[in-house]
């Protein structure tokens, strides 16, 4: 999807709005697992700058942080999620900034300082700015694994169940560095979701047999600063008209 920080264009825009204030923000680092699902067939074509399986792609990304710090604030054992939907008949990358909505969910276990930290990280790592219709909510974010099936819930708002696929030569299929990759999606394992539900932002999702992804992550603020700077340079280069003799 649905990063979906979920996409390269998102970080181009993030880099464009980053200013002096961002330089003063505390450094951070987080490690853990990404759980993700969406309405597309597996594997989600949005990561390859192709149109979604359905007219639009609706999906989520949930980060379960095992270890993390934002300045002096510990983020161990907390979670953050993002749910988005793209407009019909456009790729996620083409339509970035015009998505139907982008809602951020903060773990209710977090205290005030942790919630602020999670919000700042979420707005950097996840595609929060993909839409003009945004909200930040606090909710319980949980997961469990039963018989190889991962079950993730964002309070009363939504849930999904997914299981990794088996590769033709054994093991689990892995996707490495797709066109839409960001540091969070440099490599991920491919699965299929038994169900994806969502009841917020005026939605009533109930998808079955769609895309599911799982990834380990280890991210830092310095990594994203470097990544965003590189994307900004690429963006500038594409806007520079060719010289003629």
Where are these regions (language model features)?
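Bacterial N-terminal signal peptides
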Residues: 7-16
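Boundary at the C-terminal end of the N-terminal hydrophobic targeting segment
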Residues: 18-23
């Amino acid at each position: 999807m649905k990063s979906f920080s979920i996409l390269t264009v998102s970080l181009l825009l993030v880099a464009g709005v980053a200013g002096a204030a961002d330089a003063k923000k505390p450094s951070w680092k987080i490690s853990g697992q990404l759980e993700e699902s969406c309405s597309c067939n597996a594997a989600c074509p949005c990561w390859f700058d192709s149109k979604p399986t359905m007219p639009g792609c609706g999906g989520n990304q949930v980060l379960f942080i095992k270890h993390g710090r934002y300045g002096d604030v510990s983020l161990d054992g907390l979670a953050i999620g993002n749910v988005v939907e793209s407009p019909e008949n456009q790729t996620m990358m083409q339509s970035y900034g015009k998505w139907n909505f982008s809602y951020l969910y903060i773990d209710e276990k977090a205290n005030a300082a942790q919630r602020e930290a999670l919000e700042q990280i979420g707005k950097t790592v996840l595609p929060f700015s993909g839409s003009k219709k945004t909200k930040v909510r606090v909710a319980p974010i949980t997961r469990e694994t039963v018989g190889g099936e991962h079950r993730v819930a964002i309070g009363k708002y939504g849930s999904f169940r997914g299981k990794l696929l088996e590769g033709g030569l054994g093991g689990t299929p892995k996707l490495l560095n797709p066109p839409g990759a960001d540091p969070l999606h440099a490599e991920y394992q491919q699965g299929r979701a038994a169900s994806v539900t969502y009841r917020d932002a005026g939605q009533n999702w109930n998808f079955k047999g769609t895309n599911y992804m799982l990834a380990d992550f280890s991210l830092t603020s310095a990594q994203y600063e470097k990544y965003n700077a590189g994307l900004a340079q690429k963006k500038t280069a594409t806007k520079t008209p060719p010289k003629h003799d």
